[in-house]
């Protein structure tokens, strides 16, 4: 669109089209068969002497992602055992089986409620997810399972030293729950003083250092396109042959395109972040 919000026309009268931003990469990621995928900005490079630190922390992120994935899978398996109750329901707890009476609602048992309590505590303490209140024991278990059954990502975060880009935030979702999200400055409501204050006081910065687990508890691929927030997007200011324009872009890859993922933020040393945005960045110690 032009500055008057009219379709931007080229010299020949055709409408100008342009790339939809890095959010389009979710289609590439969705086509991958690998279980574990590492994502890093292409301009985040360093000289050989600094590579060991980067490699070490990449392994830390991968290990943490697998640890988180395995714990989530364990909870899903436990909930599925309860939901598949027939004449008799057995759930393995440690080395013992717990047997539920045929007359008993498996979702209302002390064992199921204890499991739900444990899952809610895990979501709250590990992933900063506060769950909305459920209307019944069954709904509670189903809501928890749905929240668990999502792709997993672990995102490295460095201390904020004034670099341009997004950062880690806790937001309130439409269903009443909270979640961890990476937000760009353009996504912050500048008319909301609390939101602006949160942005200015941010202690950490997103260097784009992610590890993603793409398989579900059955070892099958998630359809990542089902976990994209289609209602989000970015309007960026660009130019074409000296003419200003407004470009609508897809939800950013690590923003709206991954908004419905189970997310964990891990602080990593600033030494792992060595961007080259402009030529003068090559004068930094990390590039000498």
Locate each region found by the language model:
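Conserved catalytic alpha/beta cores of large enzymes that bind or transform nucleotide phosphates
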Residues: 43-48, 58-86, 90-120, 199-288
């Amino acid at each position: 669109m032009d500055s008057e919000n009219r379709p931007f026309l080229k010299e020949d009268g055709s409408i100008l089209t342009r790339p939809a931003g890095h959010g389009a990469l979710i289609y590439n990621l969705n086509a991958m068969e690998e279980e574990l995928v590492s994502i890093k900005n292409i301009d985040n490079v360093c000289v050989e002497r600094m590579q060991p630190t980067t490699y070490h922390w990449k392994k830390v992120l991968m290990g943490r992602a697998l640890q988180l994935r395995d714990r989530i899978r364990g909870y899903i398996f436990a909930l599925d055992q309860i939901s598949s109750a027939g004449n008799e329901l057995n759930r393995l707890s440690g080395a013992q089986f717990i047997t539920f009476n045929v007359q008993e609602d498996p979702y209302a048992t002390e064992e199921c409620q204890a499991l739900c309590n444990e899952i809610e505590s895990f979501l709250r303490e590990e992933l900063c997810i506060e769950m909305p209140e459920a209307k019944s024991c069954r709904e509670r278990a189903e809501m928890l399972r749905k929240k668990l059954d999502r792709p997993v990502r672990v995102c490295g975060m460095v201390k904020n030293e004034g670099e341009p880009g997004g950062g880690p935030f806790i937001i309130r979702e439409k269903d009443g729950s909270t979640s961890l999200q990476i937000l760009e400055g353009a996504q912050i409501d500048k008319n909301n003083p609390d939101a602006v204050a949160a942005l200015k006081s941010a202690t950490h910065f997103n260097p784009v250092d992610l590890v993603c687990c793409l398989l579900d508890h059955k070892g099958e691929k998630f359809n990542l396109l089902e976990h994209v927030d289609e209602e989000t997007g970015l309007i960026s200011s660009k130019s074409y042959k000296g003419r200003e324009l407004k470009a609508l872009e897809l939800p950013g890859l690590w923003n709206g395109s991954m908004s419905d993922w189970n997310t964990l933020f891990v602080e990593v040393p600033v030494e792992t972040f060595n961007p080259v945005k402009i030529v003068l960045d090559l004068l930094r110690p990390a590039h000498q």
